[in-house]
Structures are given as C-alpha cells and as structure tokens.
C-alpha cells in the first residue's frame, strides 16, 4: 500500500516515517488521537493527508475530486473486525441520509483502502493520482462511530468547519494555549478558495474541532465561540448533524433524485434522497413529515424518563429527564444513546427555560454526554451542556433561556454512564 508524501510550509515528510508513539487515550476525537500517537504534526489541520497540488475548501468544488457512486473501498486484510463494524455503521449513516453509497471492491481503481495505520486521517475528496487512496483508522479511532464518519466525510470531500474563511465571525483561537507543534492545525482557508455552500456556521458539525483541541493547558479553551452559548457544542461528535447531512446532499447533487417529489416535510426537512417518500428531518424531529418528536434510541425503550411532549403554561413547571447507557466501566458506547423532548406553548407565546442541574460526567468539551437546547432555528445545533458550571451565571444563578416561538426542543445524549437533569419552564 503506497502512501504519498504530504506537503505544507516547513514540513516535507512521508507518512511511512511517522513514529507510532504511545497509544491514544480512548474516547477522544481524531485530533486528540493523532496528537497523542505522534502523527498530528505531520498532517494538515491535524488529520488531513495532502498531495502537492491541492485546493482547500469547506467542501470540494472540482468535479474530478468527487467520487463516482458507489464509492469503491477495501479493507486491509488485517483490519480488525470490530473496527470494520464501526466503519460500516458510519457508511450506513451517510447512505441512509444521502444518496452517497459505498461498495467493497479492491479490484476497482481508484478505490479507498482502509487500514489500521498510525492515527485517524484521510485525504479530502478523490485523489486522481492515487490508485489506492489511504484512509487510516487505528483502533482508538473506531471507539466512536462519528469519528469514523468524520474521516469518511473528508474522503468524500469535506474540510473542517472551523477552517472556513469566515470563521473569525463565529470563533476565536487562543494560539497561546495551542501545542506549538500543532498551530498549523488551525489554518484558515481564504474566501477565494472556500466553498461552504453559503451555509450558516454550524458549531455542532461533525467536522468541527472541540473547544480544548490541542490545548497545552487542558483547563483552558483553545477555541472560543463568539456566542458563548455554543462553547460546548463544538467537536463532541454526538452525531453528524442535519447541516452536515444537507451539505453532503448538496455536494453530491442528491436533491435531484427527488426533484419531482412534493416537499411535505416540516421544520426545514426535505425528501430523503435514499427514499423520496421519507423525510430527512432536523435532529429532534421524526414521523413521516418531521411533524413529531424523534424516536429515542433502542437502548432507552425501558426508560420511562426518556422523551415526551410537555405543554407550557404561564405557571412555572418542572420536569426530570434522563438518558442511561448501562456502561459504568472504562469503555463507552460508540454511538450515544439519545432522548428528545418537545416543550410547546400556545401560539404567540415563547418558552422560558432554566436548567436547574445536570448530573453527568463533566468535561470542557462534553465529549461523553450532553444536554442540548434548541430554541430557534431547529435545523442548527443548539447550545449544549454537561456540567453545572455551564448552566449557572457568575452570580451562581441558573441561566435563563428563551425560545423564539412556541416550541423548544431538548435533546439528551450519553455515551457513558448516564445524564440526569431537572428543568423549570413556563410560557411567556
């Protein structure tokens, strides 16, 4: 298996020369894993392999760098069966939500060769000069289905969300807290090179790095959201978001498949390219036309505290919710358990919410569990929290959140142990 050299300023090396280093801490994202195994400094933006000639965009624009579908791929003969299952799960996610399909065939060229290399990395889009295009997934990478989905998205043509040329309107980078060997991982693309499909900035994108990515002092953020409500929404890989899916559908012209289908989908949803009779719905919505609540994950079927519809009145009410994993060891779930709630009020009203407490494994980036509030544009990721410090102001009072209309959506995700919370809400 050949792996071409990668080039960027002050660094010309070969991936063959990358030291294995110490094993990655489990259950982090691809950037952390690559940094810990010693390969991050050899990869553009921390997990991207590049050839000498490249064009950098949020998504690729050149037609010759998009894959003819189904995208052919092969597994290295020594690729672990457990890791293979994670790859197939990630591929299934993209196939169910888009028109992108995959076909295992090592005898077609070019194709993607998936192997257990050093770290988690991929090229961006099809590389016409390569017969076998490498996609490296060491075992730590496959602890999390959506770390794999992130790398597959690179292979299909996605760059990082935080590399957008307009990113300074939405985030700032504290370079004083970035590992000096990895400052280039936060390279920003120029507007002339950028193709972000005129999409809104998605803090929760599966292509966004986390708030503490490559930090020297892990008690301080590296990435600061201009809107601090979204500080913990960045990079926790709970799922590829509705916006990620929509951009993939635009990139591969998937909407053409349902061009003659009446769009009856609500809340910004649209006919699913894989089955035009179904809808691709924003996170938190389900049913035939996105008219109802998204179903809970299979593991929550016996959890009476998971999900439901609540009606707000002008009198404050409280409710308790929980999502549980039954995982209490050093391992975590590859895909989080999830529950959703809709809080509704009468027309002309909005909903005021205070989160009284959260009981959950706490981390700066909420990489294990998270509670999400969607208060306005339901097609975008909302603020996420996993610690009491995230929900209290400097006066030790619960922060007050208010929806823009008569609907608020609450999502709870857990990959480890459980997440319990108490909320007070009312119509205003």
From Swiss-Prot:
One of its GO terms (biological process) is molting cycle, collagen and cuticulin-based cuticle. Residues 1-17 form the signal peptide. It is found in: Secreted. Residues 306-428 form the CUB domain. SMART domains: ZnMc. This is Zinc metalloproteinase nas-27. Glycans are attached at residues 181, 377. The gene is nas-27. Metalloprotease. GO terms for molecular function: metalloendopeptidase activity; zinc ion binding. The active site is at residue 151. Keywords: Cleavage on pair of basic residues, Disulfide bond, EGF-like domain, Glycoprotein, Hydrolase, Metal-binding, Metalloprotease, Protease, Secreted, Signal, Zinc, Zymogen. One of its GO terms (cellular component) is extracellular region. InterPro entries: Astacin-like_dom, CUB_dom, EGF-like_dom, MetalloPept_cat_dom_sf, Metallopeptidase_nem, Peptidase_M12A, Peptidase_Metallo, Sperma_CUB_dom_sf. PANTHER family: DISCOIDIN, CUB, EGF, LAMININ , AND ZINC METALLOPROTEASE DOMAIN CONTAINING, ZINC METALLOPROTEINASE NAS-27. Its cofactor is Zn(2+). Its EC number is 3.4.24.-. Pfam families: Astacin. Zn(2+) binds at residues 150, 154, 160. Residues 58-255 form the Peptidase M12A domain.
